[in-house]
């Protein structure tokens, strides 16, 4: 982990992904070799074993091809790390790197039409505290194009909210993949609902909290989006044919900016 942080400067999520990949490989190899984890040797993992492991996580753990390739990249990085420090393993590293990433057909991008996004935004109840939070979350993601992970990490101090009376736009600072930061403008409607949500709270707090006043996770946000998407399907049945998640809302913003609907936001 020190190498990933200090020398590679990888983002926290990537660090965790690499750690999990190595853990899965170690457990799988120990089971196949019928050894305890602390008895494993580097020679217990060869190219054939790596291919078997990748097939296992695809078929048994139901990993997508993208996740499979992420696991492979982590193992290649581990092999390179070992070879750099122990040159006697250069051939072993080269052998593992003969295992290539798997190609996949590009997934079709799912877009929402204006009536569909409206139905999604209207699904939360404004009569409850959690309903108000969920509407604020959906509108924020719709406005900013934030990923679920980015929305989960937004703190109150990342928001710059203005009334707009002097022409100053509200904005949010989003912390994305690889430590990248970008600033996104916020509409008046988004500003108003966020002001209500964060009133009286500490600037260091996350904007979106769960019912226990703990920060929402990206998994929690995904569950919220899919729950309201199911509710919105009752109003717009065409949505039943679409796989809707946080990224679907993210895809709507570029479409919106190219349409006449954007002027009214």
Named regions from a protein language model:
Residues 1-265:
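Conserved catalytic core of the tyrosine transesterase superfamily
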